[in-house]
A protein has these predicted regions:
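Membrane-penetrating hydrophobic segments
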Residues: 1-2
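Hydrophobic ligand-binding cavity/cleft-lining segments
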Residues: 6-107, 207, 214-216
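Intrinsic-disorder/low-complexity, polar/charged segments enriched in Ser/Thr/Lys/Arg/Asp/Glu/Gln
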Residues: 10, 46-52, 127, 153-155, ...
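Beta-strand/loop substructures that line and gate deep hydrophobic ligand-binding cavities in soluble
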Residues: 23, 29-30, 132, 138-198, ...
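A short, structured loop/turn motif at beta-sheet edges
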Residues: 54-58, 119-128, 159-169, 206-212
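A contiguous catalytic/ligand-binding core that recognizes phosphate-bearing ligands
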Residues: 97-159
């Protein structure tokens, strides 16, 4: 049993995990520059996932800025991350006003800045960066204060690169840090990240392309 478990773990680490860490992304998208490195001090690149959307960046952007548990949802598995409430299937004007410093709730009904991402970077039609910093009890911390001995931190980024033919390359990536460092080696969020983010990319692509086709 232990031998089989060890082989399974080795196979995951050697074959499966590397694929999940760069799902759909090119070598340049994985290794090249990505916005937000300065937001997570001493952080390292996290998983990078990418997809091509048959619509220009200005038609993808409205779907990104309306994300959130208290807004349009996360376009993922709604029973798991949106309380069973369906994510938005159209662009909502009331959720388009997003600015640096705003909080985007994880779940509907969470209070204040607790259980929320903070908008750290925002360049319309180009990049949205959501920042999270918590202690090990998942209580939000002030990024303007010195980091404690133990914490988790991450930047969740959505980069839109314009392609010829009115298309967009959506590259989801970012940076992460876990302290103490040994704690980070005990956890592997990659399968969970892949399951949820792969769904987000698929639904975003479908929604944006359907909306673009409806306008033609």
């Amino acid at each position: 049993m232990l031998g089989a478990a060890g082989l399974a773990m080795a196979a995951y680490a050697g074959c499966v995990r590397p694929r999940l860490m760069r799902w759909g992304a090119t070598d340049d998208e994985v290794a090249g520059p990505y916005p937000g490195a300065d937001v997570v001090p001493k952080g390292q690149r996290g998983p990078t996932m990418a997809v091509t959307i048959d619509a220009p960046p200005d038609e993808v952007w409205p779907w990104l800025v309306q994300m959130g548990g208290d807004r349009g949802g996360w376009y993922s598995w709604d029973r798991l991350d949106n309380g069973g409430r369906p994510s938005a299937r159209e662009v909502h004007p009331e959720w388009q006003d997003l600015a640096v410093g705003d909080y985007v709730k994880y779940w509907r009904g969470s209070q204040g800045a607790v259980d929320a991402w903070q908008v750290a970077l925002l360049e319309p039609n180009r990049f949205l960066g959501l920042h999270g910093l918590t202690d090990l009890r998942l209580h939000n911390l002030d990024p303007n204060q010195p980091r404690p001995h133990a914490y988790t931190e991450g930047l969740w980024g959505f980069l839109l690169n314009e392609l010829p033919g009115g298309r967009t390359r959506l590259v989801i990536g970012g940076y992460e840090a876990v302290r103490p460092r040994w704690l980070g080696r005990l956890y592997s969020y990659t399968p969970v990240v892949w399951i949820m983010q792969a769904r987000t990319m698929s639904v975003l692509k479908r929604n944006v392309e359907h909306a673009a086709q409806a306008r033609t």
